[in-house]
Amino acid sequence: SDLARVKRIGYDNWIDEQFKLPIQSSHLSTVEFSASTLGQSQAYAHNVTHSWWTHAVREPGQLRQRVAFALSEIFVVSTLTVDDGRSAASYLDMLTVHADANYRDLLEAVALHPAMGQYLSHLGNRKEDGTGRVPDENFAREVMQLFSIGLHDLEDSGRPRLVNGQTVETYNANDIKGLARVFTGFSWHWPSAKSAVEWW
């Protein structure tokens, strides 16, 4: 059985073996095939769900699939906001590829993916100007609060660090404003529907 084999070769060897397995197919190709088979003009959320189950059951690299799923629960996008199933499928592919990446590369890939740009509104984010426009702070706030350092400084034990009985904030409003300035200018080339360019 699989469990007996893991016991025999050891956890470290099994993990290395799992991440060396090639990804058999992409969610994007599975979603497009599913939509085409059902006679749909585009892919929808149910096609993405079908793809996720297909890969979860059939992919030999089960560890990669499970890590990608766990990452999708942290770096959340919505098929309600991102209305093209190809976008969500491509996003799952990106998480699958980066399942064993370092955190810096993963966070960059998440930040640059159009699905996240649409969901947390930094796609097309513009710099401040003289009219009073300021950069959208939504993604910057989520990067700090949910995707990295969190609201409060923590001890090595994971408990909140206290100073004079009070928790210590890890960032403030000025930090968010500064980071929001970094996340401006992201956009994309949107080819026509007949274009061969794969824009997801």
PLM features per residue range, with description:
Residues 44-48, 58-66:
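Amphipathic interfacial helices
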Residues 4-37, 44-53, 84-200:
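Active-site substrate-binding loop specific to GH73 endo-beta-N-acetylglucosaminidase modules
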Residues 63-67, 79-87:
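Short, flexible active-site-proximal loops enriched in glycine and acidic residues
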Residues 1:
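Mature N-terminal segment immediately following signal peptide/propeptide cleavage
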